[in-house]
Amino acid sequence: MGDIRKVVFEENKLEKKLCRLVGQAIGDFGMIEDGDKVMVCVSGGKDSYAMLDILMKLRERAPIDFEIVAVNLDQKQPNFPAETLPNYLRSLGIPFHIEEQDTYSIVKRVIPEGKTTCGLCSRLRRGILYRVADELGATKIALGHHRDDILETLMLNMFYAGKLKGMPPKLRSDDGKHIVIRPLAYVPEKLLERYAIDMNFPIIPCDLCGSQPNLQRQVMKEMLRDWEKKHPGRVENLFRSMHHIVPSHLMDGEAFDFKNLEISTELSGIAARSSGDRAIDEADLDELACGTMIQGTYNPSL
């Protein structure tokens, strides 16, 4: 009995942590508002299953009212288990919609054999999901990208595209008609892997299309996992850095007006240097009396 209680305790602990992280992301970025109808995109993978499950749990205790409708896009891939998701969603007792669109044939016709089809497939899928959201009257579209997806995208853009660009937790579509949210933005993938096992989700393999894996993304994934093992805290700090941007210390002239930067006589002391390179003189000492200086950084929390 002791072992069983321990297992149940650990499962509840994981569920609470996921609820906390998802709830925090929703609150931080204003993802869901009172009266929203959230279209939860469910692919049959561990991430979207967990997202749906956690959103359902949060809806029960949230101080606001919002609807959930689960949507799956059946892209007519060979050997796709067409009844798996309908049966599962039906068992949950929630509204759901299965959209059948043969994008598989389109992608196979356009992309050469042996090449990854993920890019074109995702763009086709996005257009269909936007249309379905309109038809269902959904005000938000929830996707199951997690923290690791966001970091991998950041690194991919830096290494292969020369851009400091990630994957936003909330965005407006190019046509301005849809709001896409990523409630799992704060959730590490390893927690979702554990949760999928605990919940025994009916996972549908993601390689049914026969596409080659995105090797560049796989390299980023392995690199981040290697960092996590060898340098604890590095990945978390990398993710944290996305929350603390200092445009004046980068090189994007559109994000910061370097050309018109001039000496200012209106700012003084620590306030004048809040964006980065801080110097200390005698006049600053009173302001620092209650704080701690470490390597030139004023950290009042220490």
From Swiss-Prot:
**Entry's CDD domains?**
TtcA-like
Question: What protein name does the entry list?
Answer: tRNA-cytidine(32) 2-sulfurtransferase
The family database entries (Pfam families) matched by this protein are listed as:
ATP_bind_3 (PF01171)
Give the motif span (PP-loop motif): 43-48
Q: Which organism is it from?
A: Polynucleobacter asymbioticus (strain DSM 18221 / CIP 109841 / QLW-P1DMWA-1)
For this chain, the family text in UniProt reads: Belongs to the TtcA family.
Q: Which UniProt keywords apply?
A: 4Fe-4S, ATP-binding, Cytoplasm, Iron, Iron-sulfur, Magnesium, Metal-binding, Nucleotide-binding, RNA-binding, Transferase, tRNA processing, tRNA-binding
Pathway it acts in? Answer: tRNA modification
Positions that bind [4Fe-4S] cluster = 118, 121, 209
Q: Which GO terms describe its biological process?
A: tRNA thio-modification
Family matches, as InterPro entries: Rossmann-like_a/b/a_fold, TilS/TtcA_N, tRNA_Cyd_32_2_STrfase, tRNA_thiolation_TtcA_Ctu1
What are the names of the required cofactors? Mg(2+); [4Fe-4S] cluster
- In short, the EC number is 2.8.1.-
Q: Give the NCBIfam families listed for this entry.
A: PRK10696.1
Q: What class of enzyme is it?
A: transferase
Subunit structure, briefly?
A: Homodimer.
Q: What do the Gene Ontology cellular component annotations say?
A: cytoplasm
- Gene name of the record: ttcA
